[in-house]
């Protein structure tokens, strides 16, 4: 279920919760949960490896430029990879607002009626964004406000039954993101989120 639902905007966590309830399965072991998150990271890395590689290189260049003055670099718009790194950092910030409520939100996953209702909400969000959303914004034209709002949508998607990818893609399209960029940004934005969640589980 995790493998099929993770890359579809249908809330893998919501479906896992319902699967546990209807089949009377015990709570997922913490180690197994960590492995599921790690597998998700690997899958995103495989699909977007070129983007990730460019951003990692640019991230270390950014760090290096704080200590070493770069000669020959002209002022102006930053490279696309550098801009994407900055957008992902900004988009991840709203997650810190929901951290204090993590246990309470996780408890909602044990209520099948609530989870089912959130799955319906996800469906409505996807329908509306597909019908009315979309624009021409890309990584070069997306604003700070845009990515922060997408980050807020990602924070809201910690609620069981709300699809993280579906919610962030829909938010991006509602803000005028071009469809392909909305999908790409959503999955790249999942990397720091899933990595952070995995580290929290380990700790």
Task: Report each predicted region and the residues it spans.
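Multi-pass membrane proteins that catalyze or facilitate reactions on polyprenyl-/lipid-phosphate substrates
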Residues: 1-203
């Amino acid at each position: 279920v995790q493998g099929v639902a993770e890359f579809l905007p249908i809330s893998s966590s919501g479906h896992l919760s319902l699967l546990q309830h209807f089949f009377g399965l015990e709570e997922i072991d913490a180690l197994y949960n960590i492995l599921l998150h790690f597998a998700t990271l690997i899958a995103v890395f495989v699909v977007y490896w070129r983007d990730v590689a460019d951003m990692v290189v640019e991230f270390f260049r950014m760090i290096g430029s704080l200590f070493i003055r770069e000669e020959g670099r002209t002022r102006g718009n930053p490279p696309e990879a550098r801009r994407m790194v900055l957008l992902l950092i900004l988009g991840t910030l709203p997650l810190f607002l929901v951290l204090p409520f993590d246990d309470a939100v996780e408890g909602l996953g044990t209520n099948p009626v609530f989870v089912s209702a959130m799955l319906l909400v996800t469906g409505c969000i996807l329908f509306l964004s597909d019908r009315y959303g979309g624009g021409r914004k890309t990584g070069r034209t997306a604003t700070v406000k845009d990515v922060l709002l997408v980050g807020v949508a990602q924070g809201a998607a910690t609620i069981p039954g709300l699809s993280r990818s579906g919610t962030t893609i829909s938010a991006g399209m509602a803000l005028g993101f071009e469809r392909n960029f909305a999908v790409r940004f959503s999955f790249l934005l999942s990397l720091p989120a899933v990595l952070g969640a995995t580290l929290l589980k380990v700790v």
